A protein has these predicted regions:
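Proprotein-processing/basic-patch segments
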Residues: 206-223
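Short beta-strands within extracellular/lumenal beta-sheet-rich domains
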Residues: 106-122
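Beta-strand-rich, repetitive solenoid scaffolds
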Residues: 1-5, 10-41, 45-51, 55-60, ...
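Noncatalytic modules at the cell exterior or secretory-pathway interfaces
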Residues: 194-210
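Short carbohydrate-recognition loop motifs
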Residues: 93-108
């Protein structure tokens, strides 16, 4: 251990058997900051592990940790597909209480909506997951199956391109009209194309109403 001027522990050093990776601390000249580097093998992480509920801080602010990010896309930001569109609607609950901007998905056949996103540059261009926020139009408790598929398009690419493989998620009707419903998190959705920075990603969202497992008999309202 390294002790401070009062004899208290300042830094504890723990040995690892057969270690090959280490930290290198370099000082700096005027106008430059010191550098803490991982050295050893070709690709080496630096692991900083706070204790308990502690967080990493820069100056006095907590450092944002990269990981799973969420993005809210409401029905009002979507548009009905030209072919087999879901029906856009504004549904009043009670006067001067929340109105719902929704897309209505019928039980008889597949309906579709679309939207697009230019993801933040911090996105790793990997798979995504999703949850559907919806509300039932009836008290039926059958299973409603939602689906999502996507494709990324870059500068100079054609937008006339097929969506990737759809991934579905199933949610049973809650049995109460106008109750909020949130599906489970879907499995991974692979976006078609070659996702990269500065691309626009198009999504198609639908109700898989004509598949045998969709037994919800009412209109499913996507929020």
């Amino acid at each position: 251990s390294i002790l401070d001027t009062s004899g208290n522990e300042l830094l504890l050093l723990t040995a690892t058997g057969s270690a090959v990776n280490e930290l290198t601390l370099a000082n700096a000249s005027t106008g430059n900051g010191p550098i803490l580097s991982a050295t050893g093998e070709t690709n080496v992480d630096i692991n900083l592990n706070p204790k308990g509920t502690g967080v990493l801080k820069s100056a006095t602010a907590a450092v944002k940790i990269a990981g799973l990010e969420t993005m809210w896309v409401p029905a009002s930001a979507m548009y009905g597909a030209t072919t087999n569109p879901a029906e856009a609607a504004q549904v009043e609950t009670t006067a001067l209480r929340p109105d719902m901007k929704v897309f209505d998905f019928a039980a008889a056949a597949d309906d579709f909506v679309q939207f697009s996103v230019a993801f933040p540059k911090s996105w790793n261009e990997g798979t995504i997951t999703y949850q559907a926020f919806w509300t039932p139009s009836t008290t039926n408790t059958g299973n409603c199956i939602w689906g999502l598929q996507g494709v990324s398009v870059g500068d100079g690419d054609t937008i006339d391109v097929a969506y990737g493989t759809a991934v579905t998620v199933t949610d049973a009707g809650i049995g109460t009209v106008e109750d909020q419903q949130v599906t489970a998190v879907s499995s991974a959705v692979t976006i078609a194309g070659s996702p990269a920075v500065d691309q626009q990603t198009y999504f198609q969202f639908f109700r898989d109403a004509d598949v045998g497992g969709d037994t919800f008999t009412g209109v499913a309202r996507l929020l």
